[in-house]
Amino acid sequence: MKALRRFTVRAHLPERLAALDQLSTNLRWSWDKPTQDLFAAIDPALWEQCGHDPVALLGAVNPARLDELALDAEFLGALDELAADLNDYLSRPLWYQEQQDAGVAAQALPTGIAYFSLEFGVAEVLPNYSGGLGILAGDHLKSASDLGVPLIAVGLYYRSGYFRQSLTADGWQHETYPSLDPQGLPLRLLTDANGDPVLVEVALGDNAVLRARIWVAQVGRVPLLLLDSDIPENEHDLRNVTDRLYGGDQEHRIKQEILAGIGGVRAIRAYTAVEKLTPPEVFHMNEGHAGFLGIERIRELVTDAGLDFDTALTVVRSSTVFTTHTPVPAGIDRFPLEMVQRYVNDQRGDGRSRLLPGLPADRIVALGAEDDPAKFNMAHMGLRLAQRANGVSLLHGRVSRAMFNELWAGFDPDEVPIGSVTNGVHAPTWAAPQWLQLGRELAGSDSLREPVVWQRLHQVDPAHLWWIRSQLRSMLVEDVRARLRQSWLERGATDAELGWIATAFDPNVLTVGFARRVPTYKRLTLMLRDPGRLEQLLLDEQRPIQLIVAGKSHPADDGGKALIQQVVRFADRPQFRHRIAFLPNYDMSMARLLYWGCDVWLNNPLRPLEACGTSGMKSALNGGLNLSIRDGWWDEWYDGENGWEIPSADGVADENRRDDLEAGALYDLLAQAVAPKFYERDERGVPQRWVEMVRHTLQTLGPKVLASRMVRDYVEHYYAPAAQSFRRTAGAQFDAARELADYRRRAEEAWPKIEIADVDSTGLPDTPLLGSQLTLTATVRLAGLRPNDVTVQGVLGRVDSGDVLMDPVTVEMAHTGTGDGGYEIFSTTTPLPLAGPVGYTVRVLPRHPMLAASNELGLVTLA
């Protein structure tokens, strides 16, 4: 019989063991092995049974065992030491505090940062993620904690979490949704001084009000606020807003995003008030899902500070960072305009929004405008609300600039103000214990952030590096066998049929991993393009490979499920099922062992559709060698010695032909480059050339792929400048914001009438030489703007056959006088910087000291 209601009862801890409560509810335990070992010591079998979940362990352990441990001097000593270590971790100065103490530059650092994401993959016990976006967000929080960055994170609490994947007998994906009880998770409910739950409210129109309570997950030093709509104060349909991650239709999705953005800002205000903390100065949108946060902040400034919309927008833009993770328009949330209008439009007959009281509804809607007038684009809104934006690798930055070029019409894609911060991964979460132990031996620290750890790897005997890699591969093989057995039993097999699994996979065979979400562009089945060639690789008598595949398809994506089924059916064949397997229910615990144990990490997306691809980083962090298309981070950091590049047939329009070519290149690399190097052994059985590639990978990629490097990049290049801009715009009763907003209004009004009436060039000899002096003079009508309101530039560069400027160089032109009819004269003299076919033009751009860049407003006039 089924229970009517499920809830969790926590055990009462003896007073001497009270510290276990803090250790279990601060998720720092998930990346601190000594703390994990302490919980395992309570009851090793139960620890495994509970899935390494301290809260579940303490709820299930026999009270008599707790009483016994309360008298165990050795256990108590370890407990006291770890409790003291956690308290020290939470309070001692870390990197961020050291920067604050460093002097003048520290004045730029924000007092707090709010980080918004629809998913967070912090630990297995809190399955609030579906893929790389959530895992990245979790790594961002953990690294921010390790660095002491004052971050507050905001997301949604999903009652069902992400689905558990299993396979039917014929290999079709089946989803089940676990019911998550927040009382059984490392969460605490945010309450007020009276002990009552703090609720945030969002008015949705038609007198509907969406309310949410706030669960707080403590991620080291970083609080993660998770909004939960499943409360009695909501109507039945609104209780389900936070039921599933990426579940439901667009109506469901927009309610989630309204709650995450508007409700998320209100949750931060409530949390900082309850905890008596300084409100954050900088707001970071991890993708466009939480874009409504910017509009809520505008509402605050309009209703609470009395600002007009444009001045409030100026303040919000100055302090907002937007990160895009998608390389294709199809990956952007776009809602029907009429749907958005229903939520934000005039509900009271005065043109003001009920959802965001005090704001003109038409201004809200305009922020999401795109080429299709029937759509509201969340990424466009995010970019319009943020003064600073970035992609997640150098290549993705270039792709993003091209994709969003329309918002900066008149500028070349390279000039679009979207930068890049290459993603990173949290080493304590993803590095195998063996590598952390090696770090302690080499440098006295298991902090892989220390450069000396990587530098000293040259001291390590190749045989020892190979021993670590072999040990990790053996651990993976044991795990694969266990998961294979479980999957086959779930699919209807009996133990009598599964004797072959005991020898499936081989700890001495070259092991290739491919694990990720299953959208079409990641090409899960490229490896099956020529089944005969793959079979030869798997069954080669001298140099076999074994292949482990995992990944989930979105529940609504039958195309992705069909790709999984193809792999499963191939892997089910008796002749090579001991060499290839599809493992269902790809999650953090499976991923960790794959990253540790795979010799080669395979990635074959359609270039340039992989924004970053952090799974390959985690493999590299453990000495795995990447075999990948030059996409995402691999395009940036592949050096010819840290893995292999799969040649990309970028110019081939026929998709089938392209897949054939790239699959053929993949098979050739495995057979002719990868496998020979792995199986070439010296007299000690060590593959010297392979191990040197492992060493090189660790030394060169190890420091680069760290999320600590990523977070430092955000702090230095995005958060600190945003905090400085915010302080300028918000200071002195918002005078600077009013000035900039007024300037923007004047510029936007004048710009259609600005005209470059004439451009004259003088000074060049009949046969110009490199370095010859060119004088440019432009006559410009400024339509009411002053000369110091604009920047006039000469733009020089090589020209192609169509006279398009290539690799242009800009030279600022000085205001030299006023001509007839009120035209302003600008001129410059510059040496020719290039040889060959050269051309020039002149353009006018906005100029204001509060602009982050002259192209920020998207205004430009060309000659």
From Swiss-Prot:
Gene3D superfamilies: Glycogen Phosphorylase B (3.40.50.2000). Pfam families: DUF3417, Phosphorylase. It is an enzyme of class 2 (transferase). GO terms for biological process: glycogen metabolic process. It catalyses: [(1->4)-alpha-D-glucosyl](n) + phosphate = [(1->4)-alpha-D-glucosyl](n-1) + alpha-D-glucose 1-phosphate. GO terms for molecular function: glycogen phosphorylase activity; pyridoxal phosphate binding. The keyword Transport does not apply. Its cofactor is pyridoxal 5'-phosphate. It comes from the Bacteria. The modification N6-(pyridoxal phosphate)lysine is found at residue 618. Its EC number is 2.4.1.1. Keywords: Allosteric enzyme, Carbohydrate metabolism, Glycogen metabolism, Glycosyltransferase, Pyridoxal phosphate, Transferase. InterPro entries: Agluc_phsphrylas (IPR011834), Glyco_trans_35 (IPR000811), Glycogen/Maltodextrin_Phosph (IPR052182), Glycogen_phosphorylase_DUF3417 (IPR024517), Pyridoxal_P_attach_site (IPR035090). Belongs to the glycogen phosphorylase family. Phosphorylase is an important allosteric enzyme in carbohydrate metabolism. Enzymes from different sources differ in their regulatory mechanisms and in their natural substrates. However, all known phosphorylases share catalytic and structural properties. This is Glycogen phosphorylase. The gene is glgP.
